[in-house]
Each structure stands twice: as structure tokens, then as C-alpha cells.
Regions:
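Membrane-interface alpha helices of multi-pass inner-membrane proteins
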Residues: 139, 175-202, 234, 245, ...
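Multi-pass, polyprenyl lipid-linked donor-dependent membrane glycosyltransferases
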Residues: 94, 137-164, 368-371
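Transmembrane alpha-helix segments characteristic
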Residues: 24, 119-135, 158, 178-181, ...
């Protein structure tokens, strides 16, 4: 492997000199930043213990009985275990977060540069630019990524790839492959992100609008990454089942109590209510709300959530987004406007709004998908505004770079 890497690196160095330099620069910075910043609060609680157990045992049934955190496994933990190496041991367990943030930065940057060189600056280019800035301002503390922020970075990538796919005049198998791969990875990070597989229907609608029914379905399922995506689904569901007896924890109707390692449905329901209570600001380190079942039902929790969580968690986040948009608008502003037609993204926006409502109603904490959903909706509309500015390619290149 090292010989092959050296051969292709030397052979293609001149053609990809700038890309290679950017790649190593990004990971050089991220590696040292991972040493500086503290680890996620849940790292010592269950991220590290679960990852370490995977390095010591091939298969353990019923891990969910040892620790509540073990009931929600993630592919992050399995990737962590791959970096348990001689001499280094467990000191590289933060590597998955470095890889996700590093490769995402590289992908975003290359997409922007490519569009500038091809003179194909559009609202997607601006969306990528805004996302690149956002993740490096709000998600720069690698040690605090856990499973949540890494997943949301991939959700941004997914939205970008969907925008690219629905903007194509002709459906493209390679673009579809990237979408399948991202959906599989996102779901593998946390099972409740299975909700984001709803985007598959959006893609199917796009395919069927270009192809006849039979041809469209064949194109949809014969893609190289369709089966790997299903494998990701099966693997994460299997890990949940082997830990708790549930296909998706803590969704009680997916649980089977007749296995020796299964968690009882009563306990699953109680924990689900607790997670919902916590995410709706009904509990914290120093307080517990009275009558939790009544509190989490309907919208009884909204007033307290606004008081305890919206101020100052969400409000500070939205203020940060506003400042980011003001700065970007200042750099790219032009008094000259161009006439643009609204792209065919109404269905995507509808899907995002549905996911936003589901997030707000069931688990309105930013770490549970709130960052990606809220920011994606805001950035799409702001990108359309930026795209209306009449800037020639030279001015755009100067302002971007």
C-alpha cells in the first residue's frame, strides 16, 4: 500500500500540486487543533469505553445493560477502534472527527475553486462557501464533535450533493453514488438520522421525472453504492439489536423482549421520555421539571424551552449566523443585479421544513440535527440572494481567494 501510494503520489504530483498542498495543510492544522481542544463531554462517559471494548472483544451481547450510553452505538466508535495501534494505543481515538472535518474542508474548497475555474458560479457555489465558513467557525473544536457534529457536517455535504443532483440537466450516476454513500454514513453515525433517508424519495422523484418508471427504478437501484448504503443500514441496526434487542433505540415498537440480552420495553419507553424531556429543556444538571409526561406532551414545553434553551443557546447561534451573513454579504455585495430564475428546489425546501418541524417537535436540541437543518434552509435562500449580484469571474475570484 505504501509503495503504491508513493508511486502514484510521485507520478501525479505536478498535476495536483496545489490540491496536495491544501490537503496536507488542512490535516496539519486539524491534527494540532485536536491536541489543543478538550474532548467531548460524552467521551469519557461512553465514547471511549465503547471504542475500547471493541478493541478487546469481537462480539459482546447486551452491552446496553452495562451503560446507558452503550445503547446508542455509532460507526464513529467502530472507526475509533481501527486506530488502536501499537505504541499509539487509544490516543488516536479522535481521528474520525479529524477525517470528517478535514475531508469536508477539502471537498468544499475544491468545489469552489473548480466552479470559479469553469466560470460556473451559481447559488450552489455560494452555499458551499457559506457552509465552509460555518463549519470552521462553529465546529472548529474537533474534540467536542462527538457523534453529533460530525454527522451534521455530512448532512451539509448531503444537501450540497442533492442541490447538485437536482440542478443537473441529465441525471448522473456518479452524483447519485455520492448521495447514497453520504446517506449510509449519516445513518451509521446515529440511527435516528434514518429520518434523512427521506431524501431518497426526493432523488427518486427527480430520476422518474427524467426517465420512464421502469428505467428510472433500474437506474436508481443498480447504482454501485446502492448496496453499500443498505449494508450501512443493516450494520448500524444490527449493532443496536446486539446491544439492546432494539432495531432503533429508544423506539419501543422496534424492540424484541424475548432475547436474553434485550432491554425491557417499559425501560425503553421511560428512557425515550427522559431523552425527550432533556432535549425539551425539561431537565438539566441542577433542575428537573415536575410532571415530565405532561410537560413533554403537545407543546406544553415550549415556554420553558424558550426560557431555558432558546435564550441563550439558540439565540446566540442565530446571532452568529446573522453576523456571518452580514460579513459575507459585505464582501460580495454588488449594486448591479442580474435576473435569475428560481431553481427547482421547492421540493427540497419542503423536505427540509418537514425535518425542521420533526426536530422541533420531538428533540429540539441543536446537537440533534438542529444546526444542519436550520442553517441549510437559511443558506439556501441567502445563496439565491448572493447569486443575484452581478459579479464577473475576476471579481469573484479576487473576493473568494
Amino acid at each position: 500500500g505504501l509503495v503504491s501510494f508513493y508511486y502514484y503520489f510521485k507520478k501525479n504530483y505536478r498535476d495536483f500540486k496545489s490540491q496536495i498542498f491544501n490537503f496536507f495543510l488542512i490535516f496539519f492544522i486539524l491534527f494540532f487543533s485536536s491536541i489543543i481542544f478538550k474532548m467531548h463531554d460524552d467521551f469519557s462517559y461512553y465514547h471511549f469505553p465503547y471504542s475500547f471494548i471493541l478493541t478487546q472483544h469481537n462480539l459482546v451481547l447486551g452491552l446496553g445493560h452495562l451503560d446507558l450510553g452503550f445503547r446508542t452505538p455509532s460507526s464513529i466508535f467502530f472507526i475509533n477502534s481501527l486506530f488502536y495501534l501499537p505504541y499509539i494505543k487509544f490516543y488516536m481515538f479522535m481521528m474520525p472527527a479529524i477525517l470528517i472535518l478535514g475531508f469536508s474542508n477539502n471537498i468544499f474548497y475544491e468545489k469552489i475553486i473548480k466552479n470559479i475555474k469553469l466560470k460556473k458560479i451559481n447559488y450552489i457555489t455560494y452555499f458551499v462557501l457559506l457552509t465552509l465558513i460555518f463549519i470552521n467557525i462553529f465546529f472548529y473544536r474537533i474534540g467536542e464533535h462527538g457523534t453529533d457534529k460530525s454527522a451534521q457536517i455530512l448532512i451539509f455535504l448531503l444537501v450540497i450533493e442533492i442541490l447538485i443532483f437536482i440542478n443537473l440537466s441529465k441525471i448522473n450516476s456518479q452524483s447519485l453514488s455520492r448521495i447514497y454513500l453520504l446517506i449510509g454514513l449519516i445513518v451509521s453515525l446515529k440511527a435516528f438520522y434514518v429520518l434523512y433517508s427521506v431524501f431518497i424519495f426526493l432523488i427518486l422523484i427527480k430520476v422518474l421525472s427524467k426517465e420512464k418508471l421502469v428505467n428510472g427504478i433500474i437506474f436508481f437501484i443498480k447504482n454501485t453504492y446502492f448496496v453499500p448504503m443498505l449494508i450501512f443500514f443493516i450494520l448500524i441496526i444490527s449493532s443496536y439489536f446486539l446491544s439492546t434487542g432494539c432495531l432503533i433505540y429508544p423506539v419501543s415498537f422496534t424492540c424484541f423482549e424475548n432475547f436474553s440480552w434485550s432491554v425491557s420495553k417499559i425501560e425503553v419507553v421511560e428512557l425515550n421520555n427522559w431523552y425527550e424531556q432533556w432535549s425539551k429543556a425539561g431537565a438539566g444538571p441542577d433542575y428537573r421539571i415536575d410532571n415530565p409526561l405532561e410537560y413533554i406532551s403537545g407543546f406544553n414545553w415550549v415556554g420553558n424551552w424558550i426560557d431555558k434553551y432558546f435564550f441563550n443557546k439558540v439565540s446566540d447561534f442565530l446571532l452568529g449566523i446573522l453576523m456571518l451573513l452580514i460579513v459575507v454579504n459585505t464582501f460580495l455585495f454588488s449594486s448591479k443585479k442580474k435576473i435569475i430564475s428560481f431553481p427547482n428546489i421547492k421540493l427540497l425546501i419542503t423536505f427540509l421544513i418537514i425535518l425542521l418541524f420533526e426536530w422541533f417537535y420531538n428533540h429540539p436540541a441543536l446537537r440533534y440535527g438542529g444546526y444542519a437543518i436550520i442553517v441549510s434552509i437559511i443558506f439556501i435562500f441567502f445563496s439565491l440572494r448572493l447569486n443575484s449580484y452581478s459579479l464577473d469571474n475576476v471579481k469573484i475570484k479576487k473576493r473568494f481567494i
